[in-house]
């Protein structure tokens, strides 16, 4: 019998989790994987396109090429290119002989508009970083620590029960004390459960998360409006008529009224416009999916931790509307599942609990580890019958 008890003690000692208090803060993920992907794309993609636009401008020189008159010198031709790029306006003569002016400034503003887009898309990230991350990190550290500690306390409790059973000469006394302790809820540690229930009444994290994604949708909509209103109007215009008869050149008769110019960077402009629409169109469903995850609970994660004493948010139906801070915390617990050492142990115990023939006697990890340690989780039937015979 002593050998069996020694084996049980070793098994329970191995089931205890190591203390990793010092290194946990560095390993915490304070952004969900999809949010991180959205951040890299929404901020990094405009910067990539901006680099492409600047690289094309530096490699090919002037972004326009004007067809100056043949009697113009090289310096005059360079002046025409520079003047037409500065004005970047298309002059078109209508039926009445009047000139209408159409600005082509989106071509000139392309790299800077991409930079402004990247800065705007980074604002929701800054909002989350400074408004939510400090509170979220402290919540996660406390909850992860308490979940693992609750698991360890359960194992230590089984170790203590095993020692009491070894020292007790009368099994009736041991089981009577055990039943009394169960009825008086000595085995439960309700601090964590109450803290999580309190988080259901808090809405700071969920409001910040909703605002972050709402801003992303707003800036994406503004990008669509900008591209549709300004880029689409000049999307196919490769050539334009430029007028340089301004200032001192206004009275010069040898200077033509209009000079035809060609946009050499039109292909880059079109690539940037089309790729921006395509990328942000793909990202919109991802952002909406991130928002819809707040409308349902991660019940699988909760059901596994139901094996801890006093962690019965599901069984007691304490979960209400999922749009609160607790649901956000559960999403980040799932993202930081590698930091929850107790999760793998409890997952295994849940599988074993579902397959055991005595599952009607097993509710918590204390019950199951008691069974694995060689003790029955409830008073044996022969002892119950013996007690009934003594006290009919």
UniProtKB/Swiss-Prot annotation:
Glycan-carrying positions: 71
Catalysed reaction, written as an equation: Ca(2+)(in) = Ca(2+)(out); ATP(in) = ATP(out)
Keywords, in A-Z order: Cell junction, Cell membrane, Endoplasmic reticulum, Gap junction, Glycoprotein, Ion channel, Ion transport, Membrane, Transmembrane, Transmembrane helix, Transport
InterPro entries referenced in this protein's UniProt entry, alphabetically: Innexin, Pannexin
GO CC terms of this entry: endoplasmic reticulum membrane; gap junction; plasma membrane
Tissue: Skin.
Family recorded in the similarity comment: Belongs to the pannexin family.
Protein's recorded name: Pannexin-3
Organism of origin: Rattus norvegicus (Rat)
Gene transcribed to yield this protein: Panx3
């Amino acid at each position: 019998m002593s050998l069996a008890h020694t084996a049980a003690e070793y098994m329970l000692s191995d089931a205890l989790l190591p203390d990793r208090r010092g290194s946990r803060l560095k390993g915490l993920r304070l952004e969900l994987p999809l949010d991180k992907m959205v951040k890299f794309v929404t901020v990094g993609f405009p910067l990539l396109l901006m680099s492409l636009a600047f690289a094309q401008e530096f490699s090919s020189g002037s972004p326009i090429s004007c067809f100056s008159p043949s009697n113009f010198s090289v310096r005059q031709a360079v002046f025409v290119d520079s003047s037409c790029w500065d004005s970047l306006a298309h002059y078109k003569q209508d039926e009445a002989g009047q000139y209408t002016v159409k600005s082509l400034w989106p071509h000139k503003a392309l790299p800077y508009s991409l930079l402004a887009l990247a800065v705007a898309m980074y604002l929701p990230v800054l909002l989350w970083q400074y408004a939510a991350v400090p509170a979220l990190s402290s919540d996660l550290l406390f909850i992860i620590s308490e979940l693992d500690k609750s698991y360890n306390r359960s194992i230590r409790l089984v170790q203590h029960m095993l020692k009491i059973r070894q020292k007790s000469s009368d099994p009736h006394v041991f089981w009577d004390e055990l039943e009394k302790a169960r009825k008086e809820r000595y085995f439960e540690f309700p601090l964590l459960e109450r803290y999580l229930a309190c988080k259901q009444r808090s809405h700071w994290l969920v409001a910040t998360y909703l605002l972050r994604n709402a801003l992303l949708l707003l800036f994406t909509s503004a990008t669509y409006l900008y591209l549709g209103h300004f880029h689409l109007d000049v999307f196919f215009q490769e050539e334009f008529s430029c007028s340089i008869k301004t200032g001192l050149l206004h009275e010069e008769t040898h200077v033509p009224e209009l000079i035809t110019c060609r946009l050499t960077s039109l292909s880059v402009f079109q690539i940037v416009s089309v790729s921006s629409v395509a990328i942000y169109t793909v990202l919109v469903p991802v952002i909406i999916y991130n928002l819809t995850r707040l409308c349902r609970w991660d019940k699988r994660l909760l059901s596994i931790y139901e094996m801890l004493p006093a962690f019965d948010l599901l069984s007691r139906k304490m979960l209400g509307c999922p749009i609160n801070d607790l649901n956000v915390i559960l999403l980040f617990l799932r993202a930081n599942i590698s930091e929850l050492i107790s999760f793998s142990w409890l997952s295994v115990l849940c599988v074993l609990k579902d397959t055991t023939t005595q599952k009607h006697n097993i509710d918590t990890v204390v019950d199951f580890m008691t069974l694995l340690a060689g003790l029955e989780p409830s008073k044996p039937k022969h002892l119950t019958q013996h007690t009934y015979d003594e006290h009919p």
